[in-house]
Swiss-Prot record:
GO terms for molecular function: androstan-3-alpha,17-beta-diol dehydrogenase (NAD+) activity. The keyword NAD applies. Its EC number is 1.1.1.53. NAD(+) binds at residues 10-34. It catalyses: androstan-3alpha,17beta-diol + NAD(+) = 17beta-hydroxyandrostanone + NADH + H(+). Homotetramer. Keywords: Lipid metabolism, NAD, Oxidoreductase, Steroid metabolism. This is 3-alpha-(or 20-beta)-hydroxysteroid dehydrogenase. Pathway: Lipid metabolism; C21-steroid hormone metabolism. Belongs to the short-chain dehydrogenases/reductases (SDR) family.
Length: 255
């Protein structure tokens, strides 16, 4: 059982989608959560939905002072910080040749630098708590070369590498660091890019479909936060319907 009783978890990008569902599952497992996002109305509403175990704080992940405030708030409200889910991010859909330098820098700043600042800021609090678990949300695009993801893919490869080096550095402090790599999953954000639910829509994926809901990803996140994963660090967990394992026979044969 993924028991998070007595643990406090900060979840970025917590207003909706995967972040909100991870918060729901964490609270159901006994955790107290601080949802952090720039979508203040949605974030506050999600926190209200979750009741007394949840709080909401505004957080721009690229601003170090915002991080310091959120971590201090979590400690003041709940006494400790035991978990961090670095989920906030933005996507892109452009070829390398046509993507602007400005856009590339923006995506990397949010998706990668934001993860770095978050880990850097939370480490002292986790050391004070006697350890903790950091789950960084990367992507299937951080496991393979994927067209039309120049800035996004670069940032998610960076998250994967940053997770591994942090796991090496922080292991003796009893702080575990792992990355989760979702495949195409239906969320409010991905729906805007044309992601469709239903069997058979993605024949190049062994399971033939996208993730139907964020809950299919959130379960892996909560598992890594819990003590049932106490000997798991530096791992990269693909939750992608087998997409990064390899193409299906029908896809290879052009059927």
């Amino acid at each position: 059982m993924n028991d998070l009783s007595g643990k406090t978890v900060i979840i970025t990008g917590g207003a909706r989608g995967l972040g909100a569902e991870a918060a729901r599952q964490a609270v159901a497992a006994g955790a107290r959560v601080v949802l952090a996002d720039v979508l203040d109305e949605e974030g506050a509403a999600t926190a209200r939905e979750l009741g007394d175990a949840a709080r909401y704080q505004h957080l721009d992940v690229t601003i170090e002072e915002d991080w310091q405030r959120v971590v201090a708030y979590a400690r003041e409200e709940f006494g400790s910080v035991d978990g961090l889910v670095n989920n906030a991010g933005i996507s892109t859909g452009m070829f390398l040749e046509t993507e602007s330098v400005e856009r590339f820098r923006k995506v990397v700043d949010i998706n990668l630098t934001g993860v770095f600042i978050g880990m850097k800021t939370v480490i002292p609090a986790m050391k004070d708590a006697g350890g903790g678990s950091i789950v960084n949300i990367s992507s299937a695009a951080g496991l393979m070369g994927l067209a039309l993801t120049s800035s996004y893919g670069a940032s998610k490869w960076g998250v994967r590498g940053l997770s591994k080096l942090a796991a090496v550095e922080l292991g003796t402090d009893r702080i575990r660091v792992n990355s989760v790599h979702p495949g195409m999953t239906y969320t409010p954000m991905t729906a805007e890019t044309g992601i469709r639910q239903g069997e058979g829509n993605y024949p190049n994926t062994p399971m033939g479909r996208v993730g139907n809901e964020p809950g299919e990803i959130a379960g892996a996140v909560v598992k890594l936060l819990s003590d049932t994963s106490s000997y798991v660090t530096g791992a990269e967990l693909a939750v992608d319907g087998g997409w990064t394992t390899g193409p299906t026979v029908k896809y290879v044969m052009g059927q």
